[in-house]
């Protein structure tokens, strides 16, 4: 698997608890979603304090840092950059000012129209410290809140402007907000801490973050919903009307932790079922089935169970090496595979093997693992992908925004098989994948090219010449003036700026 992660977000309102440490623990549970940087912002009733830096959660924070961040509300973020450069300036949360106070925002996802929105804000003398879409969102909310003097109005106006996939958490000194894109592409769940009736709440990208802080799952944040939590309790309103539901299906395939729950089912059980379906569609006559750790293992178990073949541990993962796909260049990715994985020769030597991975994206990782297994003595190596071919780039929070990098967009199955050096190669069908996941609407644009949110027309160079989606959008630029005029017409914003 060579996909880049997206990000993890967390928010907590718990006035009588150590919100900074709760956030720190939750970010540990979400560390798999991003390893570039980490950050925490805390509201203490008077102002917002923030600490963020590049590195893992354990590298950014120590006890002294957390002791210096008392408060009643907090948000946290662990980042893998999908829009904008990496570095301290791109670490989240991002800050913006509202009159005499501050807000801090953390974001998972990607905004497809952030370039044009950044230009609009720059023309209004708003400056930026980074080139990230997340800072654009923070500055948009700050701008509209300063104009209307209502934070929820500022959030709703921003939601009317931004396009793409997003789950965002935001704090001011005395309140927590959580909101999600109207298609529900990026995940966000609500949980409760403490006894029934206590005003202690958390929001997170995955339920595994609720578990680690002792929270009980309540529900998903609805697509288009804005949740506000303060001393007055929890309230909800719709910032946008929901559109056709389009949950990112790669949360099931790869991104989410196996112990997270989506639609009432553990991600582990879904991946196990994907492996069984894969075995039905692309069986192989072998002695041993192994999984590529960690995300390929549940599917490998299901594959072996369906074919009644021995399942074994043929690859050992070095858990102290950052994930290979986090590496910024192809050369470093290739080196990273060997740093991260090693084959068990006494398990695989002399055996015909099926190696199950969650996906084949660029082909680099698969090629190197096949060679590792051959070097360890495997007589045959058959590769199976527990997801369909990744043919189309993603623009909603996964760093595959260039079709030229996707091996299945350029090669047939047989050509990929030869490229990675396997004896055979098989992919789970899209129909088979959809039969395994909970029944709901999904974004499967990376497999099908059906994009739920229109792609800006100037993204055309990111597609191969023969592959263009149907819904390239000519321009998003004019909408800014329309939203401003609507606020003026409703008496929420002064007509003279």
Predicted feature locations:
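Phosphate/diphosphate-binding loops
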Residues: 157, 208-209, 213-217, 224-225, ...
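Conserved short alpha-helical segments that host acidic/polar catalytic motifs at enzyme active sites
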Residues: 1-223, 228-286, 292, 380, ...
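A conserved beta-strand->alpha-helix junction
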Residues: 130, 135-138, 311-322, 419-437
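Amphipathic alpha-helical
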Residues: 136-149, 293, 304-323
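PRPP-dependent phosphoribosyltransferase catalytic core
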Residues: 159, 174-175, 214-220, 240, ...
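Secondary-structure transition/capping motifs at alpha-helix termini
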Residues: 126, 147-148, 283-287, 305-312, ...
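Generic beta-strand/beta-sheet core signal
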Residues: 106, 171, 179-180, 191, ...
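Short, glycine/charge-rich flexible loops or terminal/linker lids adjacent to PRPP-binding catalytic cores
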Residues: 308-353, 363-364, 391-399
